[in-house]
Regions:
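Gly/Ala-rich beta-loop-alpha elbow adjacent to hydrolase catalytic centers
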Residues: 63, 78, 82, 87
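A short, Lys/Arg-enriched amphipathic alpha-helix followed by its capping loop at the start of a domain
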Residues: 18-24
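Short, Asp-centered acidic motifs that coordinate Mg2+ and/or phosphate
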Residues: 46-47
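Short glycine-rich anion-binding loops that position phosphate/pyrophosphate groups of nucleotides
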Residues: 52-56, 82-84, 175
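Alpha-helical hinge/cap motifs
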Residues: 6-9, 82
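Amide-donor transfer/coupling interface in amidating biosynthetic enzymes
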Residues: 2-4, 11, 17, 28-43, ...
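The conserved beta1-alpha1 loop
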Residues: 5-6, 51
Length: 194
């Protein structure tokens, strides 16, 4: 079963639906309605997805604690706020984006042969809803960049993968209607298949 941590985002159940389409059961819990103890002893997930949300990682309930507790035990995927939370949990700094992107489609790169991008083209369009990003200068060395986009001719991190553990983050929204359903579902399916 996959645990989907809901950061009070309207797209959370789009993610849940994509997970269900793979045949994997999903349990959705709000970021302030569970505990590490409950996750370990009662829920016992095989993987964890951390949803988008309207706040910062500091305001995302249990998310950073979950990442710190489970990163070396279970595969984790963070989407948007979840991606930022992964960066921050490992020491990255979350900063205001130079360009705010709410409901905008951008071209993403597919770099470094990430398992979650397996079967995707080298460039694909995806939807962005964010005003925060991981500062590239602060990206912990334990991560590699698996996706970028360009804003004002500057690279913006759109995807990261831990070098030693199956921990992934995507800043864009694979579950948004503005992202090709084929590509969005493929990312979720690839993660579920790990």
């Amino acid at each position: 079963m996959i645990l989907l941590i809901d950061n009070y985002d309207s797209f959370t159940f789009n993610l849940a639906h994509y997970i269900e389409e793979t045949g994997m059961p999903v349990k959705v819990l709000r970021n302030d309605k569970t505990s590490i103890k409950e996750i370990k002893s009662i829920i016992k997930p095989s993987k964890i997805i951390i949803s988008p949300g309207p706040c910062t990682p500091n305001e995302a309930g249990i998310c950073i604690d979950v990442i710190k507790e489970f990163y070396n035990k279970l595969p984790i995927l963070g989407v948007c706020l979840g991606h930022q939370s992964i960066g921050q949990a490992f020491g990255g700094i979350i900063v205001q984006a130079k360009k705010i992107m709410h409901g905008k489609i951008s071209s993403m790169t597919n770099e470094n042969n990430s398992e979650i991008f397996k079967g995707l083209p080298k460039k694909f369009d995806a939807t962005r809803y964010h005003s925060l990003v991981i500062d590239p200068k602060s990206l912990p060395s334990c991560f590699k960049i698996i996706s970028n986009t360009k804003d004002n001719d500057k690279d913006v991190i759109m995807g990261i993968e831990h070098n030693d553990y199956p921990v992934f983050g995507v800043q864009f929204h694979p579950e948004s209607i503005g992202t090709s359903k084929v590509h969005g579902q493929k990312i979720i399916s690839n993660f579920v298949s790990l």
